[in-house]
Structure formats: C-alpha cells, structure tokens
Regions:
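Conserved catalytic network of the ASCE P-loop NTPase/AAA+ motor domain
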Residues: 21-25, 67-73, 129-131
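Hydrophobic/aromatic beta-strand patches that form the interior of the parallel beta-sheet core
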Residues: 30-32, 76-78, 137
Length: 174
C-alpha cells in the first residue's frame, strides 16, 4: 500500500521520478492510494500545479506508462467512481461522526463545490490516457465494499499466477 502525501518542491517538478520510486519491483505488488493521476485532475483544479505542469503531464504520461510496462510492471488503472449524491452523503457522515470526523479536511469541502470541474477533467483524463496497453477500469463505488471486491476480483481474473483456477458458473446462474 503506497500513499505518498504532499509532494516536495523537487517532487512536484519531477513528477514521474517521484512515482517511479513507488512502483513495485519484480515479484512485488503495490496498491496506490491515489497515483500520478492527481496531476490530471485534483492538482489543476485546486491550483496545486501550473498549467504547464498539467499539459506536460498529459503529454508524457502514456509514454511513461508504456516504459514502465516494457520494464515488466503490470499496470491496472482503477477509477473508483462516486455519484455526487453519495459523495455528499459521505461528507456529511464524516462531518457528523465521532469516528469519521478526522477524515474530513477543508480541502474535501472545497472539492465538493468543484464537482463539474472534476467531471470535466476526469473525462479529459479518460479520453487522453486510456490506451490499449493501459486502459482505465471504472468501478462504481457508491457501495465501498462491492467496489473493493469488484476491483480485487478484476485483478484476480486478469493476473496470471501459480495455481490459478477459473471457476465456471454453476448451472443455476446461467
């Protein structure tokens, strides 16, 4: 599990090197909470990167991902999609819960007001960075548990590993 946090000044201007260090080595697996794609959506909307940094990222990301895959990295890009209503429900739950209040930041409250901008940047990201070698897999995440199980099931089906068995549907499910 990898969560890099707020980038340093150097990391902000050396974006791919920052994330390259977080990728797994041969025989390892990494799950990234967020990824280099914060540069494609969150950072430009919230003013955390310049327009030039955003455009450079969008221009170079597909080639960088191809290089990683050519070096043996198996890359699966999940986008956990949430409806605006569900996002608002989760924000209210965080705000009003003694167990979840710590999850809520001022940034979260700003983000919900920029839903349309996030939607636009998300669509641009999908259109420009979903490739044959590295497509986006969008998962409905209104139900967290089902979303997590769906993503794990996807990985188990997609990944080759020793002793893998593909179960056939039972008769009643056909």
């Amino acid at each position: 599990y990898v969560q890099l946090g707020i980038p340093t000044k150097w990391e902000s201007s050396h974006w791919f090197q920052r994330w390259g260090k977080a990728l797994p080595r041969k025989g390892e697996i990494s799950f990234l909470d967020r990824s280099w794609y914060t540069r494609a959506i969150t950072e430009p909307i919230m003013g955390y990167c310049s327009e030039n940094q955003y455009r450079t990222f969008m221009k170079k990301v597909n080639k960088w991902e191809d290089e990683q895959m050519n070096n043996g990295v198996e890359l699966t890009k999940f986008y956990f999609s949430l409806s605006k209503d569900q996002q608002e429900i989760r924000m209210k739950a965080r705000k009003n819960s003694e167990l979840k209040y710590w999850k809520l930041s001022k940034n979260d409250e700003k983000i919900i007001t920029k839903w349309n901008a996030f939607t636009l940047y998300k669509e641009q990201m999908f259109n420009q960075t979903s490739t044959d070698n590295s497509p986006w897999v969008s998962i409905n995440s209104n139900n967290k548990m089902i979303a997590r199980l769906t993503s794990l099931r996807y990985l188990l089906i997609k990944t080759e590993y020793e002793g893998k068995k593909i179960l056939k549907p039972t008769k009643w499910s056909k």
